[in-house]
Swiss-Prot record:
Subcellular location per the Swiss-Prot or TrEMBL entry: Secreted, Extracellular space, Extracellular matrix
SMART domains linked: WNT1
Known function: Ligand for members of the frizzled family of seven transmembrane receptors. Probable developmental protein. May be a signaling molecule which affects the development of discrete regions of tissues. Is likely to signal over only few cell diameters.
Lipid positions (O-palmitoleoyl serine): S1
Species whose genome carries this gene: Thunnus thynnus
Keyword Mitochondrion: no
Pfam families documented for this protein: wnt (PF00110)
Residues making up the signal peptide according to the UniProt record: none
Record protein name field: Protein Wnt-6
Gene3D superfamilies: 3.30.2460.20
């Protein structure tokens, strides 16, 4: 009597944080392009920029200024938003307040902690 070994292989998705980090890296390195005359070629806008490959993110139009309210784009702007003065990401005051400055305010929250002694 013979025996068979069954082996199953599959691809596993990376952790969500890793996917986000990779996308952010590509977003930060995105290249502005315009279409070539042949309708197939993408030409980088600017000097000393390498042509994009299949892994690069590209764009053809500049993003609107989300710092200011704009009915056309649906942006409410960032004026009056709460920010984190110690954060270095998009929730940080330096980025969110668009270099307009900000006012610091201390807020104290009281809540039941459901502690047991």
């Amino acid at each position: 009597s013979g025996s068979c070994t069954l082996r199953t292989c599959w691809k596993k998705m990376p952790h969500f944080r890793e996917v986000g980090d990779r996308l952010l890296e590509r977003f930060n390195g995105a290249s502005k392009v315009m279409g070539g005359n042949d309708g197939k070629t993408l030409i980088p806008v600017g000097q000393n920029i390498k042509p994009p490959d299949k892994q690069d993110l590209i764009y053809s139009d500049e993003s609107p200024d989300f710092c200011l309210a704009n009915r056309k784009t649906g942006s409410l702007g960032t004026r009056g938003r709460m920010c984190n003065s110690t954060a270095m990401d998009i929730s940080g005051c330096d980025l969110l307040c668009c270099e307009r400055g900000y006012r610091e305010e201390s807020v104290v929250f009281e809540e039941n902690c459901l502690c047991r002694f």
